[in-house]
Regions:
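Glycine-rich anion-binding surface patch
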Residues: 1-113, 117, 121-129
Length: 129
């Protein structure tokens, strides 16, 4: 499936800004269709739950839209900073290029949201291919 690059960019901006109302509207724009395709509805739901912090939903969305792509998390504590500053880093990488070139690297205190942003960035990158 191909996605509209501008709609994805708008969605990513709403996620990064933490704009709940804007996110819901942009999420429907990206993952809804007039015929209400069930697969797209599930993607919209997974995206919404990942935005709210569900790692299961982030993983399900990743599998649905980036089948065959790699992913992983790293923990960063930031140069001796206290643990409360810990950030999870979500990596999303192209198939067959796991160590060579990751497409998206996102740091966020909310690992599900980091994974969601990394997934959206990867979809945006696919629009340019």
């Amino acid at each position: 499936m191909t996605y509209d690059k501008q709609a994805l960019t708008d969605l990513m901006a709403k996620i990064e800004a933490g704009d709940d109302a804007g996110f819901r509207k942009a999420n429907r724009t990206v993952f809804s269709t007039p015929c209400q395709d069930m697969a797209l509805q599930l993607r919209e739901e997974h995206s919404r739950h990942a935005y709210k912090g569900s790692l299961d939903a982030a993983k399900a969305l990743h599998a649905a839209v980036l089948g065959g792509w790699g992913w992983r998390f790293d923990e960063h504590y930031g140069d001796g900073m206290p643990a409360k500053f810990e950030r999870k880093t979500a990596w999303v990488s192209m198939p067959d290029n796991w160590r060579v070139g990751h497409t998206s690297l996102v740091k966020d205190n909310n690992p599900a949201r980091a994974w969601l942003i990394a997934t959206i960035k990867a979809l945006i990158a696919e629009c340019d291919v």
